[in-house]
Curated annotation (Swiss-Prot):
GO cellular component, one term: cytoplasm
Oligomer status and interactors: Monomer.
EC number: 2.4.99.17
Keyword S-adenosyl-L-methionine: yes
Protein name listed in UniProt: S-adenosylmethionine:tRNA ribosyltransferase-isomerase
Organism, scientific name: Campylobacter jejuni (strain RM1221)
The organism's taxonomic lineage, starting at the top: Bacteria, Pseudomonadati, Campylobacterota, Epsilonproteobacteria, Campylobacterales
Localisation per UniProt entry: Cytoplasm
Signal peptide start and end residues: none
Keyword hit for Transferase: yes
Cystine pairings recorded for this chain: none
Amino acid sequence: MNKDLLLSSYDYTLANELIANYPTNPKEDARLLVFDRKNKEIFHTTFKNLQDFLPNCAIFFNDTKVIKARIYGNKASGGKIELFLHQPFLNSHDPLFLAQIKGRVKKDEILYFKDDLKVRVVELLNDGLRKVQFFQNDKTLDTSNLYNLLDKIGHIPLPPYIKREDEKSDLKDYQSIFAKNLGAVAAPTASLHFSETMLENLRKKHEIYHLTLHVGAGTFKSVECENIQEHKMHSEFFNIPQQACEIIDSKQAILGVGTTVTRTIEYYARTKTKNGFCDLFLHPQNPPIRQNHLLTNFHLPKSTLIMLVSAFIGREQCLKLYELAIKEKYRFYSYGDAMLIL
């Protein structure tokens, strides 16, 4: 079988000390590895110098906003419970939600949280997932009311590879400066590097567009089948404004900031769907057909995200660049450094 389709072909070894537990401060001082595909050139610089390398292009950002999706509570017996909200079931008659619960629970069990928030376990699903209903003062909470309450009592859901509790600084650090549409349970991390000053400077030379893709917990789901074509990609809600669609439909060069932007642009390029659910899986055998350039962080081995990067530059080239980044001690994952692919 073609090696590009084998999960084991996307593996690499990373020392724990290269996993960033906190962002660089100031954030635009993060490092940036630039790879020019046409000339096969590599540059090592800092993120604040991004504009020095950008060609004439429109820049697309994901303006999703991370929910405080993690809450801690108790069972009636007093046992501790941790609930991680994933997403609402949009097609259900009553407001129901998908959540991951740490701790053994039964169907119809009631769980208790701060501010008189109660959760009823409606259904036990696979992979530790549960269908749940939220109540406060015995009234069912819809998505909007729940998100407002979580903003008071919830915690920022840091990724599983950041081995610490969330802190006050994460409220700002794990949210992009243009985040406005609540619904993500993970940040579109390439966006986290941008400061207001950088954005202002970019606007002077580039057209900026926003789209929304609510990053789901599935972004951390590991690929378990050796033939990656058998992997079932998670589905995430997206919305693209008309003006952004017109740019995608044009011949204008596009820089996508982050893998979520890339998947949304490429889904639209294939389907002409402006609003719905995206489950597009990009890899070297299913490469991009519209987006020209990519700005992204360094991703986990064997993840759909490293496969997406490989779809742009080829698997072997991607692994070579990761090997170089490790040698040069770049910082990896959500709070880590960035890579620009031209």
